[in-house]
Amino acid sequence: MLLTRVPAVALCAVIFSGLFSSVLSAADLEGSRDLDIVPRLADAEIVDFRPAAELERVYPMGSIRKISGQLRFDGQVSARGNLTSVTYQLPAEHTSDDAFTAAREALQQQGAELLFWCQARDCGESSLWANEVFGNAKLFGADDRQAYLLLRMAEPRSDTLVALYSITRGNRRAYLHVEQFEAAAPLGELLPTSATLLRQLKSTGKLELPRLAGEPQEAWVTLISRGLNLDSSLRLIVSGVSASAWRDALIGKGVRAARLETGALDGKGLKIEVIR
């Protein structure tokens, strides 16, 4: 029997073809269009579209709340640039989680780096996300049926941010909101939150950090160790050219040595995988 190896990219294209559609829906808002970096979920309809406009944009990197009339969150990314957004109403056969996951995976396949990821009540109040952050009342729904993700695209588009927000409303209608922000000036170094690293690790089984190709960087060691110590039950394999040095650095920050094994000493950057 002849076995043919299918390239990963081709295999993913086959998988996603059942989820995504490039065909515009007749019910789409007039003048709207898809964003080139996030394919449309099959049978989804565009119900809100805002063409590129230059503005100052603030993206939360923490649970949001309102105190004395002011929106509060632990961290943020703020910059001036061009913002384009599209909101999809999803077909009944797909949940908001389906759309969110498919969009996230499509962006990660393009090398996008996750900066902040929250789900359900960890995000704060849906009404604040809908009205204060995105200015779109269609996105107001149940606090426990929401998800938000902020990503940074890979080179050569590293000054592009993408925000995803999914929600299921009380009437069970599900929506996915996507924003593409092109910064007018270089964004510089942006670090993810420790909780986001842990969520990514537990959701996908791995962390791939190609930019961390050299010796351990103090800021990253601190972030990763804090994330790993949020769930001490995980056992992990650390791989990469400097895997041994990273393992030692993480142990030095309080991660138990028994939890960490050293994997292959090659590859691009740093890779951490969950031992199943």
Regions found by a protein language model. Give the residues of each.
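An acidic-aromatic pocket/loop used at catalytic or ligand-binding sites
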Residues: 25-230, 244-255, 261-276
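Bacterial N-terminal signal peptides that target proteins for export
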Residues: 1-12, 19-22
